[in-house]
């Protein structure tokens, strides 16, 4: 449940979402739920100038392991072989709740994904991960470039979390608050 559930090689620009309530099970955000690839080829997607204001984005859970994963303000999840660039976007006065990989701008980027976030801001937003990987800008990422971004929101994760053995790929960010 997002404005765009899944996108592949998209250009999305200058959208504003205000006073929305978005709920679902995973790969969830106000703008794009998941940025995907087709047939394993490398794909590029651009999200620019999008704003999410005074909204609630939260996952539901019915006991499935993937419930509550990859919840973000602008994008939920980035699949393998995807290059995502988020530029000049902001999330303001929102509440974002999930279990794993919850971020103010991006929830999570999977192994072999590459995300670049520039000139984007999380302002006065409460980000909560009930299990792990909560971040003001990004919850979890494989290859990540962040430039000229800021977070002045509240970030809350579980009191005690551990990284599962063997599940941390090289060049990853895990349980880091940006």
Language-model-derived ranges and their functions:
Residues 1-178:
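Predominantly extracellular beta-rich ligand-binding scaffolds that present long acidic/polar faces
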């Amino acid at each position: 449940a997002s404005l765009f559930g899944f996108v592949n090689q998209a250009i999305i620009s200058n959208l504003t979402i205000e006073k929305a309530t978005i709920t679902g099970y995973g790969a969830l955000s106000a703008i794009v739920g998941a940025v995907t690839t087709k047939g394993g080829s490398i794909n590029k997607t651009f999200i620019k100038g999008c704003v999410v204001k005074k909204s609630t984005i939260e996952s539901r859970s019915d006991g499935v392991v993937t419930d509550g994963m990859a919840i973000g303000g602008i994008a939920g999840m980035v699949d393998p072989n995807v290059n995502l660039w988020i530029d000049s976007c902001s999330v303001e006065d929102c509440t974002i709740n999930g279990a794993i990989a919850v971020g103010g701008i991006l929830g999570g980027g999977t192994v072999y994904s590459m995300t670049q976030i520039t000139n984007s801001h999380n302002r006065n937003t409460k980000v909560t991960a009930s299990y792990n990987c909560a971040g003001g800008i990004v919850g979890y990422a494989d290859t990540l470039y962040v430039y000229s971004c800021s977070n002045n929101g509240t970030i809350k994760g579980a009191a005690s979390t551990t990284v599962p053995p063997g599940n941390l790929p090289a060049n990853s960010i895990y349980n880091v608050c940006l």
